[in-house]
Amino acid sequence: QSVVFLRCEMTAGTMAVAEVAELVHKCFPNPTVLLVEAGGCACISVALTRRSQAEQGATVVDRVESTGAFDPGRSEYADFLGALAFGRLSQGDLWEYLVDLSRTVALSRAIGGLGFYPVCPARDREKLIALTSRYDEMGASVKRLKEQRRSKDITLNESAKLRMEMKEEERRLRAVADEIKEICNGRSR
């Protein structure tokens, strides 16, 4: 099986690059890697495909990992961009390369919250990937709680409950961030 690599250009100011990338991935039966440029921002998106279990001969997008829009000139993205170098990714076969590329992209989503690209010893990589996934989920949960709290038709009591729930989720988010930092500094538990 082959992999499709595409470079796409979008108009400056377009912020839904990850969503557009997901739509483009569905157009191809092969695994795809997209480099999307929108003005000064970039997005790297990797789609892994598999054979459909329901429809014989068909392929479906199994998983999509996307960076979202980022400024490649910002210093905190330097390590991530370096990690994308061909020689630094797994070279066993094309599938291993693609899975490693996908994991590298998944780890990049933590840059915004942590302020750095998480790198760790190989023995801790799976744990780091699981923690960054949890970090993503908790960050989305905090964002969702903030949006609910800003709702115009929410009572004062409901707002207070949401605030307490949000503070607890933020505490958990900080704990996961601390655990990620420990792994990256070589002091994993």
Where are these regions (language model features)?
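Residue-identity detector for glutamine
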Residues: 1, 53-56, 91, 148
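Serine/threonine-rich low-complexity intrinsically disordered regions
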Residues: 11-17, 90, 121-124, 176
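Generic structural signal of hydrophobic/aromatic residues within well-ordered alpha-helices
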Residues: 20-24, 98-101, 105, 176, ...
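Catalytic nucleotidyl-transfer cores of nucleotide-processing enzymes
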Residues: 43-64, 68
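Negatively charged, Asp/Glu-rich surface segments that serve as flexible interaction/assembly modules
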Residues: 61-152
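Alpha-helical oligomerization segments
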Residues: 122-189
